[in-house]
Amino acid sequence: MCRMSFKKETPLANAAFWAARRGNLALLKLLLNSGRVDVDCRDSHGTTLLMVAAYAGHIDCVRELVLQGADINLQRESGTTALFFAAQQGHNDVVRFLFGFGASTEFRTKDGGTALLAASQYGHMQVVETLLKHGANIHDQLYDGATALFLAAQGGYLDVIRLLLASGAKVNQPRQDGTAPLWIASQMGHSEVVRVMLLRGADRDAARNDGTTALLKAANKGYNDVIKELLKFSPTLGILKNGTSALHAAVLSGNIKTVALLLEAGADPSLRNKANELPAELTKNERILRLLRSKEGPRKS
């Protein structure tokens, strides 16, 4: 989240920023009408009165500033705009108002952030809908490659995810490190998100650049509800490109329920990882060892 500074040049400007932040419309009007406060005055980081009012969701102050000539599309040093802040904080009434006066969805922050990415990251479904209706690019990405869908998946915002998918978001679009939306949803334990993405065509075996898959990550974390959803789509249970398996990860995590789920799905306890280790060699947990050995017998016979 972008932080705001409130260091001002003059006491009157300081008062104006306080009024915008607190939603004190009467004081804000008084200061603006005095002619001694520029409607586009900035703090040391380029923050404007409009940005502050938009961030706080004070629609009356936003309206007053715009009607007094505030530049809607000014950017802070970080690249953020009033629209970005309103979207980030979920103030849909402010977002709609700003669009009525020419707010642009094209501006980016220093890390590539846009209003759509911010709204998706924080789960503001109505704001996402408004932004898309006003031309926001569904394929916006942070400079690390994260899309709106990726950020919504990371947060587990199912309503936003459904909206983005219905609007044409690419379900398998990864970040630069290869992390796909399904992978991040699995890592965070969002089983309903995982289910929806799989039904919409997410690659069950999509791997990050380091070779880990969604199943391996869920096994490592012990997210059994996620694992159950992934297993419905028959993901790879064998040794992955990174030289280990989901079963190895589950054994290391010490979650016997996870180990049982994978074994019941057909994971092979006789497979060795890149260090030539069997899953059973990675634990001293007697219950897990008994479970592994109970599955080894039939395979060796």
Curated annotation (Swiss-Prot):
It comes from the Eukaryota. It holds the Pfam family Ank_4. SMART domains: ANK. Keywords: ANK repeat, Repeat. ANK repeats lie at residues 11-41, 45-74, 78-107, 111-140, 144-173, 177-206, 210-239, 242-271. The keyword Flavoprotein does not apply. This is Ankyrin repeat domain-containing protein 29. The gene is ANKRD29.
